[in-house]
C-alpha cells in the first residue's frame, strides 16, 4: 500500500459517509412532505420484500400529501399493510385505485424533535469520519514501521489526513445547520 492509496481510501470513505448522511436526512420530515420518507418501506411482492418505488409510483401531490399508484391493483392491500407496519406516523387512505398519505402539519415541538434527530445523524457521521481518520493514520504508521515511508513523509501524511477530516467535519456541520434551518422553517 502507498500513501496515494491511503489518501484515496480516506476520501472515498469520508465521501460515502456524507452520502449515507444525505440518505438519512432525506427520511427526516421537513415542512413539506418528501417521497424519501417512504423509500425504506418494503412491500411483499410475490414473496419478495421489494422497495415501494419498484411496485408503483410515489409522488408528492402537495406539501402534505403523498400519492402511491401501484402498477398492479392487487398490491394495494400489501402496500397499505407495509405502510402501517413502517410506523411513519400516518395511516394510509386506500381508495381502490391509489393510496394517499396525509401528513398533518408539524407542530413546533415536532420540528424541534426532528431537528435534534438531524443533529444526532450529523454526530454519527462525524464519528464515522473520525474512525476513518484513525484507520488511515494506522495505515500510515504501518507504512512507516515497515520502512516504506520516512518519518517526514509520515508526518505530512498524518497532516493531510487531518486536513481531509477537518474538511469533511465542516461539510457535515454545514449540512446539519442547513437541514435544521429547513426543518425549523414554518
Curated annotation (Swiss-Prot):
HAMAP family recorded: RRF
InterPro entries: Ribosome_recyc_fac (IPR002661), Ribosome_recyc_fac_dom (IPR023584), RRF_sf (IPR036191)
Example GO biological process: cytoplasmic translational termination
Family annotation (CDD domains): RRF
Protein biosynthesis keyword on record: yes
Gene Ontology cellular component terms for the protein in this record: cytosol
Protein name per the record: Ribosome-recycling factor
MF terms in GO: ribosomal large subunit binding
Subcellular location field: Cytoplasm
Keywords, alphabetical: Cytoplasm, Protein biosynthesis
Species the sequence originates in: Wolinella succinogenes (strain ATCC 29543 / DSM 1740 / CCUG 13145 / JCM 31913 / LMG 7466 / NCTC 11488 / FDC 602W) (Vibrio succinogenes)
Domain of life: Bacteria
Keyword Protein biosynthesis tagged: yes
Family listed: Belongs to the RRF family.
Annotated function: Responsible for the release of ribosomes from messenger RNA at the termination of protein biosynthesis. May increase the efficiency of translation by recycling ribosomes from one round of translation to another.
Underlying gene: frr
